[in-house]
Amino acid sequence: MLPLLGLCFALPLCAGLLEEARSWEDTSDQVGLRIPRQVRLLQRLKTKPLMTEFSVKSTIISRYAFTTVACRMLNRGSEDQEVTFQMQIPAAAFITNFTALIGDKVYQGEITEREKRNGDKVKEKRNKTIEDNGEKGTETFRASAVLPSKDKAAFLLSYEELLQRRLGKYEHVVSVRPQQLVGRLTVEVTVLERPGIAELEVLGLQNSRQRGSGRGPDDSGPPPSTVINQNETFAKVVFKPSVVQQAKIAQNGILGDFIVRYDVNREQSIGDIQVLDGYFVHYFAPKDLPPLPKNVVFVLDSSASMVGTKLRQTKDALFTILHDLRPQDHFNIVGFSNRIKVWKDHLVSVTPNSIRDGKVYIHHMSPSGGTDINGALQRGIQLLNDYVAHNDIEDRSVSLVVFLTDGKPTVGETHTFKILNNTREATRGRVCIFTVGIGADVDFKLLEKLSLENCGLTRRVHEDHDARAQLIGFYDEIRTPLLSDIRVDYPPSLVERATRTLFPNYFNGSEIVIAGKLVDRAMDRLHVEVTASNSKKFVVLKKDVPVEPRKVGIDVSQSPRPRGRGQEEPNHLERLWSYLTLKELLSAWLQSIEEPERERLRQEAQALAVNHHFLIPFTSMTLKSAPRTEAPEAAYGMSSTSMATGPETVMQSLRGTHLQPGPAVKKPYNPRIKISKTSADGDPHFVVDFPLSNLTVCFNIDGEPGHILRLVSDHADSGVTVNGELIGAPAPPNGHKKQRTYFRTITILVNKPERSYLEITPSRVIVDGGDRLVLPCNQSAVVGRRGLEVSVSANASVTISIQGTVAFVVLLHLYKKPAPYQRNHLGFYIANGQGLSSNCHGLLGQFLNQEARLIGLSKSPAHPPVPEAGERSEAVLEVKGRQVPVVWKQRRIYNGEEQVDCWFARNNAAGLIDGEYKGYLAAHPFDSETAFGPGLSQGL
C-alpha cells in the first residue's frame, strides 16, 4: 500500500487557474473512531516525529534559479505516525520534481498530462489548503505519509523560477519554516552571473508575507551564522544556524524568509545576450535615461468593507506617493463605492498646491456603500482619454490607472466578462491598468485579468502592519517610466520561437527578458535591433552581437526525464526559454475568450510542460514506486548508516524520474590504477613527469585561500577541465611561511560525449550528469554512466575514469585529531593522460606532451647527483624554448609512501609555466574560460 496520505501542490500561476489538488490515497475510511477523551490522552502520550535535517540549496545561473529542498524525519514513537512535509515556494516558481523515501521504499513523481474533467475546461478554483499570496507571495506545498515506528523518511522537492528585477535588485527568497528546531539546518545559495555581480546583500530573516517598500538599505544585517563568499562573478551564501541560534530566532521553528538580493553589472547598449547550445537569452535594462511624464489616475475603493486599517493605511501610502509625483506629471483621484466620486473633472499638473489639495481630498474619504468596479474604471479611463485628446502634449507620456480595491463587484455591472470587455474597449491599448488587491476577500482573478489585458501588473497586499509599505513598494516599481513602445527585433531567418518582443513600457529598476532558439547553432553573429520612445525622441539601437555559444559560464543541467538517442543535454538557457514560454502561454490562455483558441493554448502548454517536466495547471504529478534496492538512501545521495549525517550527503537536486535506485550504485571495489608522478598535492606541491625526457620537475604555488587553480584544461578537444579550490591554514611553528594552502575541492567538468560535473571534497563526491548523485567518502562505491566511471575507496581515494583514455586519482588526506595547522585536504594525480590532446593546458596539463632537458649537466638528468651536506645541486632547465634555473630536491608523494627526485623551479614556477600564476585563476569552480599566459586562452 502506498503510504502517502495526501499531497497538495501549489502551482505557480495566477490565482484562479489551479485545479483542486489530488490525494494519492484517501484513508479516512480506515481510521477507527475513538472516544474524544481517549484521543486527547493518546495525543499527549505521542512522541512527535523528529525532523533530523532540513536543507535548501539554490543555484542561480543568469537569474534563473534551481532550488532543491531536502527534509529528513524520524518516527521516534512506538506506533505508526503521520508525518508532514511542508514548504512555501514562490508563487512564480514551477515545481519540477518530488520524491519521497519512506523506510526502504522510494516514490518518485512523474509529470503527465492532466485530463480535462467533464470534457470542458480546467476548474478555476484552488484547494483551500493552499496559501496563495498572489504574484509576489508564496504558495505552500504539502505532503503527508504514514511512517512506521522507529523508521525514517526523506522528502525532496525541486522547483525553478526566473528572478524578476524590481527596484534595481533581484531577490531570491527561501522559506525557512521547518515547524521545529532542527539539528542540521542549512540554506545554501550560489549565484553565477557572467556580467559580474554588482552588489549582493543578505537581509535579516523576515516573517512578513511581503517585504515593504524597498526604500533604503535593510540595516538588520544577515542572520547569525551566515557566511558569504564572493568574487566578481560568483557568490556563495551559507546559512547554517545551530539549534541554540534557531531557538533565539524562533522556538517554534518558524524562522522566516531567508532573502538574498543582488544586481549585475550592465553595459549601456543593446543589453546582455547569452547563448548556449542553440538557445539564447537577452536581458535589456537601460538606465540613466530621462523619465517619461506620467498621466496617472488613482482609483481608490472607499466602500464599507474598507473601514478601519485598510483605508487608513491606503491613505498613508497615497500621501507618500503624491509627494513622489514629478513636476511634469499630471494626476487625478477617483473614489468609489456604490457612487463614483471624482476629485477634479480633469487631470491637473503637479504643484505644491495640487498635492496639498489632493491629500485633503483623500483624508476626507470615508467608507460606505457597495463596490462599483466597472463604473470606477470607466471613469478613470475616460479622464485619461479626455486629457490626451484635448491637450497638445509635446513630450511623449504614459497613461496609467492605479486601481485599488478589497472586494468583489457588488454594484452596477457585476459580471466579470462584461467588466473585462468594457475595460478593454475603453483603454484601446493606450492606458495601462495596475491593480492592487487588499486582504483575503478580493476578487484577485478579476484584478489579474484586468492587468494582463491592459499592459499592467497586479499585486496582492495583505492587511497587516506593513500594508502601507507594500503599497509604496508597488508604486515605486512603476513611478519612473523610461521608455515606451519598446520593440526588439531579431532576423527571422536566424531566430525561431522567441518569447514576447513587444513591450508597452519599461520602468526604471525593472528588466526586459527575451529568450529564443537559434535556427543555426554554428552562426557567429546575431543582429539585434531595439526601437523605443523616450520623452523627446525615438530611440533606435542596433548591434551585431558576437555569438560565442561556449562562453556563458557553467551549464547546470536540469534534465527532468530520460533522454532519447540523439537528444542533447538540456541547459539552463533552454530551461529559461521553456519557463518564459509557458508563462506566456498560460497568460494567453487566461485572457483568451474563444474556446478553440483556449484549447490550442492548453495543448501547446501541456506538451511543453510535460517535455520539460514542469508542473502547471494542465499537467499533474503522480507518485510511482521505484524498484526496491538494498540501499535506497545511497542511491539518492543519502547515508545508509544514518539518516542524520548532514546535508552534505543528501542528493542536492532531482533531475527527473530517470534516476532509479539500484543500477547506479554497484558493489564497491578497490581500484588498482598505477598513478603517475604528475600531481598537485600538499601545500600545494606540484610534480611534473616528463616521460619523453626521462625527467621530473617540481614547483610550488603560493596561492591565497579561496583561489581556484586551473589544473587541466582541454575543454575544446577532449572536453575535460579540472580545477582545484584552495583552503588556508596557519603555518606550523618555526616555519618560514605565515600560512599554508591546500586543495579543499577538486571540480571536474566533462563535456564529451555528454556534459557531466564532478565535485570532490574530503567528505563527499557529487556526480551530476543529468542525474545528481552524492556519494559519501567514508563508504566505498562505484558509479558509472556513458563513458564516465567514479570509484570511491572509503577514506582513501576517488578515481575518475573518462572514456577509458583519461584517469585521475584524488587522494583524501584526513586527520582524526588535526593540529591547528592541519586541514583535511585533497591531492590530485593524473593516472592516465592518453586521451588528453596536444593542446591541453593548465598548471599540470601543459606539460603532458612536452619535452624538457637540462643544460650543462654531465650526469644523467633522471638521476640528479646526491649533494653532500650543505651543498646544493643547481642546473638550467630548457622547456618550450625557455631556460629556467632549477635546483635538485626530493619530494614525497602518494601520502608520503614514495620519494621522488626532482628539479625544483622557484618563484611560483616563473618561466616554467606559460605566463604568470594569476593567469591560471578560475572565476568559479566549473569555469573553463581562463587565460593562460600572454595570448593564450581556452574557453568554454
From Swiss-Prot:
GO cellular component: extracellular region
Domain VWFA: start-end pairs: 295-478
GO BP, sorted A to Z: hyaluronan metabolic process
Pfam families: ITI_HC_C (PF06668), VIT (PF08487), VWA (PF00092)
GO molecular function, one term: serine-type endopeptidase inhibitor activity
Region annotated Disordered, chain positions: 207-227
The entry's keywords: Glycoprotein, Protease inhibitor, Secreted, Serine protease inhibitor, Signal
TM regions (residue ranges): none
Span of the signal peptide: 1-16
Subcellular location: Secreted
Domain VIT: 35-161
Glycan-carrying positions: 97, 127, 231, 421, 508, 694, 778, 795
Protein's UniProt keywords contain Cytoplasm: no
Functional summary from the UniProt entry: May act as a tumor suppressor.
Similarity field: Belongs to the ITIH family.
Protein name from the UniProt record: Inter-alpha-trypsin inhibitor heavy chain H5
Lineage summary: Eukaryota, Metazoa, Chordata, Craniata, Vertebrata
